[in-house]
Curated annotation (Swiss-Prot):
Family in the record: Belongs to the GcvT family.
Catalytic activity: N(6)-[(R)-S(8)-aminomethyldihydrolipoyl]-L-lysyl-[protein] + (6S)-5,6,7,8-tetrahydrofolate = N(6)-[(R)-dihydrolipoyl]-L-lysyl-[protein] + (6R)-5,10-methylene-5,6,7,8-tetrahydrofolate + NH4(+)
Superkingdom field: Bacteria
TM segment ranges: none
Quaternary structure (record): The glycine cleavage system is composed of four proteins: P, T, L and H.
Function: The glycine cleavage system catalyzes the degradation of glycine.
Gene Ontology CC, one term: cytosol
HAMAP family referenced in this protein's UniProt entry, alphabetically: GcvT
Protein known as: Aminomethyltransferase
Keyword vocabulary terms for this entry: Aminotransferase, Transferase
GO molecular function: aminomethyltransferase activity; transaminase activity
Claim: Transferase is one of the keywords in the record: yes
UniProt EC number: 2.1.2.10
Native source species: Salmonella arizonae (strain ATCC BAA-731 / CDC346-86 / RSK2980)
Length: 364
């Protein structure tokens, strides 16, 4: 039986088409995925992301533990509320999960991890935390709503108390603050400004209804996927998994190689991959008719004249751009063009950086 978030009833009242998403009943859309997508790019939309797992870590050695657990280095986190994006890797350098870590005090950090990987994440964290005497608290008492879009922060702020408005005023991206009963973070998965707001489960339904009244459009998983793909953001299980290195998933920037004496899980394997060479994640654009889909082959000829083949990890029609885009994992050495086999047709595609839209504007 699929689980329900505390907002399940609100979704049905808003006319959602519900689907089973990794064991959770979640809204796919509320009538028009396209309208929801455009609302986030031009105004404000919101997503129920309560299926994600919030994990609080307490203990005097928490920073030391996270410097070993994560490929990125929490030594960078010195300001209260600052957040960091990182991969959590296995010994062979594969990605167990990608997550966000927040720093509050030396003995209090918070992780937000994916729903599909919840059980293995918690088992892995618990296993490696034991020598550090870390107290692990899974915050199933909290719901999480993402409010995204150019007008999202302004509309969300109409629900805040004066204390909460003061707390978030001037807050830069990738920070979080606990203000009253809300945890408000300037993070998201759309390429737009906004907040991800955690609150007690019993407050979630009222907060959702108030956002609707403030003119924030409910959005489902469908729009969430097209928005994150336009923004060039990875989806666990597609761009990366336990068999795929962050180096092959455009996550090289999340690996903190310095200081060289910091040992983290997967470091040795990554250093070998970096030396030998590895696949890369690129963007693809196809302006001709048709849609680039997951798992289609991508072929190109490298500089040595060798035929090479990669694979599309995520592909869709981009509502913002009006043509098809994709992320693809390919051997190193790809040029500016490639060929994608769509049914029995060989379609030319342009190779770009793996990001297409930022703050509503085309970048590809």
């Amino acid at each position: 039986m699929a689980q329900q978030t505390p907002l399940y009833e609100q979704h049905t009242l808003c006319g959602a088409r519900m689907v089973d998403f990794h064991g959770w009943m979640m809204p796919l859309h509320y009538g028009s995925q396209l309208d929801e997508h455009h609302a986030v790019r031009t105004d404000a939309g919101m997503f129920d992301v309560s299926h994600m797992t919030i994990v609080d870590l307490h203990g005097s050695r928490t920073r030391e533990f996270l410097r070993y657990l994560l490929a990125n280095d929490v030594a960078k986190l010195t300001k209260t509320g600052k957040a960091l994006y990182s991969g959590m890797l296995n010994a062979s350098g594969g990605v167990i999960d990608d997550l966000i870590v927040y720093y509050f005090t030396e003995d209090f950090f918070r992780l937000v991890v994916n729903s599909a990987t919840r059980e293995k994440d918690l088992a892995w964290i618990t296993q490696h935390a034991e020598p550090y005497a870390i107290d692990i608290t899974v915050r199933d008492d909290l719901s999480l709503i993402a409010v995204q879009g150019p007008n999202a922060q302004e509309k969300a702020a109409t629900l805040f108390t004066e204390e909460q408005r003061n707390a978030v005023e001037g807050m830069k991206p990738f920070f979080g603050v606990q203000a009253g009963d809300l945890f408000i973070a300037t993070t998201g998965y759309t390429g737009e400004a906004g907040y991800e707001i955690a609150m007690p489960n019993e407050k979630a339904a009222d907060f959702w209804r108030a956002l609707v009244e403030a003119g924030v459009k409910p959005c489902g998983l469908g729009a969430r996927d097209t928005l994150r793909l336009e923004a060039g953001m990875n989806l666990y299980g597609q761009e990366m998994d336990e068999g795929i290195s962050p180096l092959a998933a455009n996550m090289g920037w999340t690996i903190a190689w310095e200081p060289t004496d910091r040992d983290f899980i997967g470091r040795e394997a990554l250093e070998m991959q970096r030396e030998k060479g590895h696949e890369q994640l690129v963007g693809l654009v196809m302006t001709e008719k048709g849609v680039l889909r997951n798992e289609l082959p991508v072929r190109f000829t490298d500089a040595q004249g060798n035929q090479q083949e990669g694979i599309i990890t995520s592909g869709t029609f981009s509502p913002t751009l009006g043509y098809s885009i994709a992320l693809a994992r390919v051997p190193a050495g790809i040029g500016e063009t490639a060929i994608v086999q769509i049914r029995n047709r060989e379609m030319p595609v342009k190779v770009t950086k793996p990001v297409f839209v930022r703050n509503g504007k085309a970048v590809a």
